[in-house]
Amino acid sequence: MGKITFFEDRSFQGRCYECSSDCPNLQTYFSRCNSVRVDSGCWMLYERPNYQGHQYFLRRGEYPDYQQWMGFSDSIRSCRLIPHAGSHRMRLYEKEDHKGVMMELSEDCSCIQDRFHLSEVRSLQVLEGCWVLYEMPNYRGRQYLLRPQEYRRFQDWGSVDAKAGSLRRVVDLY
């Protein structure tokens, strides 16, 4: 079980809301979010309701302002607790519909370009565990939660292009 607390103001001030499960609409609990405390679990925060918009991956720790989680604004409107998995495995494809060259991955990758000579990923399959895909190397830029399923094109994971810079396994000790 996870636990996350949202605060309207920076440095854990102002009205707060504690959450322990997925919530598709946080708007009724607070109007803005400027700081977050994650007591347990790994979470994906979303800029808009129903798990839409920019995504932000947070693990256990304190985030005194939204820049700490690479946020673009103080808008957090939904959140999802990411289930813990023991093992991780995924396949990256250079073309849509799982075609073209395939690379398999079971560990974090700080630079997809250096490791696989790819700057774009057009489809992928998450076989085990949850992952976060970052648009830039070294775990920077836009973030996308990847859960076990098939993604036949980059739009399936919520991206507007096929840019893929790095991948990180979602790992947390509850």
Curated annotation (Swiss-Prot):
Q: What is this protein called?
A: Gamma-crystallin C
Assigned protein family: Belongs to the beta/gamma-crystallin family.
Ranges for the Beta/gamma crystallin 'Greek key' domain? 2-40, 41-83, 88-128, 129-171
Q: Which organism is it from?
A: Mus musculus
**Result after altering S11G:** In strain: CD-1
Q: Which InterPro entries match?
A: Beta/Gamma-Crystallin, Beta/gamma_crystallin, G_crystallin-like
Q: What is known of its domains?
A: Has a two-domain beta-structure, folded into four very similar Greek key motifs.
* Keywords linked to the UniProt accession: Eye lens protein, Methylation, Repeat
In-chain residues carrying the UniProt-annotated modification S-methylcysteine = C23
Q: What does this protein do?
A: Crystallins are the dominant structural components of the vertebrate eye lens.
The Gene Ontology biological process terms listed for this entry are:
camera-type eye development; eye development
Residue ranges, annotated region (Connecting peptide)? 84-87
Miscellaneous: There are six different gamma crystallins identified in mouse lens.
Q: Which GO terms describe its molecular function?
A: structural constituent of eye lens
